[in-house]
Swiss-Prot record:
Oligomeric and partner information: Part of the 30S ribosomal subunit.
Family affiliation: Belongs to the universal ribosomal protein uS17 family.
GO molecular function annotation: rRNA binding; structural constituent of ribosome
Encoding gene per record: rpsQ
HAMAP family listed in its UniProt record: Ribosomal_uS17_B (MF_01345_B)
One annotated Gene Ontology cellular component of this protein: cytosolic small ribosomal subunit
Name under which the protein is recorded: Small ribosomal subunit protein uS17
Highest taxon in the source lineage: Bacteria
Membrane-traversing stretches: none
Function: One of the primary rRNA binding proteins, it binds specifically to the 5'-end of 16S ribosomal RNA.
Keywords annotated in UniProt: Ribonucleoprotein, Ribosomal protein, RNA-binding, rRNA-binding
GO biological process: translation
Amino acid sequence: MSEANVNNQEKSTRKVRTGYVVSDKMQKTIVVEVEDRKQHALYGKILRSAKKVKAHDEEQIAGIGDLVRIEETRPLSKDKNYRLIEIVEKAK
C-alpha cells in the first residue's frame, strides 16, 4: 500500500461529531457538548446522554451557542482530542 492510501484509511476512521459550543473562554480551545442518543434494548425508549469535550479552534471563530462539527485527532493536550472542522450554524 502506498502512503496516500494509508493516510486516507486513517482519516476515514476518525469520528466526526456534532454539538453545541458551551464555552469559548480558553485561547484556541472550545468546549462542545455532544449529545448521544441510544435506544433501550428491551423497552425501546430513546435515552439521551451528553458529554462535554474540548476541541481545538485555531482561528478562534466559534462562539457560545454555535452548532459545530468536530473531528477526532491525535491528542493535542491532556484532554483535547478533537479539532474544529466547520461551524454548521451560528448562534443568534
